[in-house]
Amino acid sequence: MNIKETELLFQAGALDVPIIKKHDQGDGWTVTLNGTHKLNPLFETARGQIRVFKRLDAAVGVLFEVGFKEIKTVQ
């Protein structure tokens, strides 16, 4: 799901606490947005590829901008 879809689902209350985890295929962090929706739960770029954040604080910043108050981080 991309940023626009994330914002809409957040406003509708359809998202759980986001989970940030270390990217499986190298350096960086990915965001999983589970909830009551049928979209791909991984945060994506506008072109549909999985968005990999180089820095953890960048991922957290985007989620705070959407409006999340709580974020879970796992390794």
How does the language model describe each region?
Residues 1-22, 41:
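The feature represents the first ordered module of a protein
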Residues 54-68:
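A short, charged, amphipathic alpha-helix used as a generic interaction element across diverse proteins
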Residues 10-11, 32-35, 57:
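Alpha-helix boundary/capping detector
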Residues 70-75:
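Short hydrophobic/aromatic patches at helix-to-coil boundaries
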Residues 1, 25-29, 63:
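Short low-complexity stretches enriched in small and charged residues
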Residues 21-48:
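Short aromatic-glycine-(Arg/Gly/Cys) micro-motifs in beta-strand/loop hairpins
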